[in-house]
Amino acid sequence: MVTLFLRQGENGKQVLLSFPATTPAEKADVAATMESLKSMSKTVTIQGAASEVMNLGKYLHGVDLAAEGEVERIDQLAERLEHMSEVDCDKFAGMLDANSISGTKDILRLTERLDDYVILPGCGSAQSMGKYLVGCGAFPVPEKLIGYINYEAVGIEFCDAHGGAACSRGYVVRKEGLPQAVLDDLHTSKQTYEMML
């Protein structure tokens, strides 16, 4: 579910509106609320949002819900988010931060690309990223040099080359172009996790 914090005009009434609107009663409520807000002002802007994707409000802020097609796009977005797992919601938050977003169309397009991204677990800093890369073999180092590695520099170089953004579970990055050792490690980790369930 996505709950929007809306404002009528610049200084008008503030309203909460939740999506997706799936039942006829919910759809009628959304339509009535929007008609009421639009009757006194041409704009109904999103001031914030509450959802499982923690940073979604940042990307929806300022969107004029009274504009053509915006209510439908928000409803479609909320529907897609409702079907995402908690892990996918965290991944999607990182995907939003890692991409250039300029409206609801971009956000909707990005929901279709979840499988193009991975989370590098526990990588919340350049230092932890470097340790992960060395540990999984993506950055091979002779055993006798392990104590001399500048993990932060390794992590920074990786981030510069691959982009991405942090999320609550690690670092979100596109799969395309990742070292095979990283992909293999993620695959092995996923299998181990599934066996433990």
Predicted regions and their residues:
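Acidic, low-complexity, intrinsically disordered interaction modules
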Residues: 142-156
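N-terminal ordered "arm"
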Residues: 1-44
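Non-Sec secretion/translocation targeting segments of pathogen effectors
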Residues: 150, 190-197
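Short amphipathic beta-strand/extended segments with alternating polar/hydrophobic composition
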Residues: 16-20, 58, 183-185
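Mixed-charge (acidic/basic) macromolecular-recognition segments
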Residues: 29-141, 145, 176, 185, ...
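Conserved aromatic
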Residues: 20-24, 120, 148
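Long, highly charged low-complexity segments enriched in Glu/Asp and Lys/Arg with interspersed Ser/Thr
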Residues: 156-190
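Short, surface-exposed beta-strand/loop "edge" segments at domain boundaries and coil↔beta transitions
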Residues: 11-16, 53, 178-182
